Amino acid sequence: MLFAAVVFSSGFRAQAQDPPPGGFKNALLTLGKSGKVALTYTLWDQQVGKGTYTLAFFWASWSDEAREELPYIQAIQKKYAGKVKVLGVTYGDEIQDSMDAMVELGMTFPHFVFVEDAEPDGRFDIDSIPLTILFGPDGKIIARDMKGEEIEKAVEEALR
């Protein structure tokens, strides 16, 4: 089940509302420069495999290891802007906790929110987080299970 929340900002704490009719399927959360979290609706396949490389970072607010990996992901976002799209995927987390962490950690890349250990179509074989997957312009997986500096090495190799 793909799930996210309608979000508004109150100070620095993002707040979720009740789901709109039809639920939160295909919702994408983005932290703006103002510190507010915005909601749009899009399909996973509209974000991945559209002629650009995509780095998907599966994480949860409670994962210390995911927080340790975040600087590597943010460095890719900054260094390869326009060449590599970075998507966060909160996984197995409470929605409010995910939104709070996005604000706290300054995660400005868009996020899909998966709850109840659901994943899109079961296609990624997620057995632990954090998990980083690099997709090619065709949407096929190029590399996965990268950590730390391995992430940038995989991106550099793919862009050659």
For each feature predicted by the language model, list its residue ranges.
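Thiol/disulfide oxidoreductase modules built on the thioredoxin-like
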Residues: 103-108, 114-158
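N-terminal targeting signals for export/organelle localization
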Residues: 1-36, 143
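Thiol-based oxidoreductase modules, predominantly thioredoxin-like and allied folds used
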Residues: 82-97, 107-117
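Conserved redox-active cysteine motifs that mediate thiol-disulfide chemistry
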Residues: 58-78
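Solvent-exposed loop/turn segments at secondary-structure junctions
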Residues: 60-64, 91-96, 117-119, 140, ...
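Short pre-active-site segment immediately N-terminal to redox-active cysteine/selenocysteine motifs
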Residues: 51-54, 58-62, 128
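Hydrophobic beta-strand anchors of alpha/beta hydrolase catalytic cores
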Residues: 55-56, 86, 132
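A short beta-strand-turn-helix
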Residues: 26-54
